[in-house]
C-alpha cells in the first residue's frame, strides 16, 4: 500500500470511527477499493444518513466513487 492509499484508508476509517464497523481494502484493476460494513444492524438503521454523509464527505474530498447496499459501503479511487 502506498502513501496515498494509506491516507485515503485513514480518512475512511476516521469517518466511521464512531460506529462498530469492519473493513477490507484491495486493488481491483487500477482502483484502490475500501469496503466498509457496519456490523451492528440496529446501529446502522439508527445512523444510516449520518454514516452515508460522513463517507460521502470523504469521497467528495478525495474524488472517490461511493456506493452502498444496506449496511455495506463501497469506496473506490484511482491514483495516477
Language model region names:
Residues 1-33:
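An N-terminal amphipathic alpha-helical segment
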Residues 20-80:
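Acidic, low-complexity, intrinsically disordered interaction modules
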Amino acid at each position: 500500500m502506498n502513501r496515498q492509499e494509506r491516507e485515503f484508508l485513514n480518512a475512511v476509517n476516521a469517518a466511521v470511527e464512531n460506529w462498530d464497523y469492519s473493513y477490507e481494502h484491495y486493488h481491483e484493476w487500477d482502483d484502490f477499493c475500501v469496503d466498509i460494513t457496519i456490523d451492528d444492524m440496529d446501529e446502522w438503521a439508527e445512523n444510516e444518513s449520518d454514516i452515508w454523509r460522513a463517507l460521502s464527505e470523504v469521497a467528495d474530498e478525495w474524488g472517490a466513487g461511493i456506493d452502498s447496499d444496506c449496511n455495506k459501503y463501497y469506496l473506490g479511487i484511482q491514483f495516477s
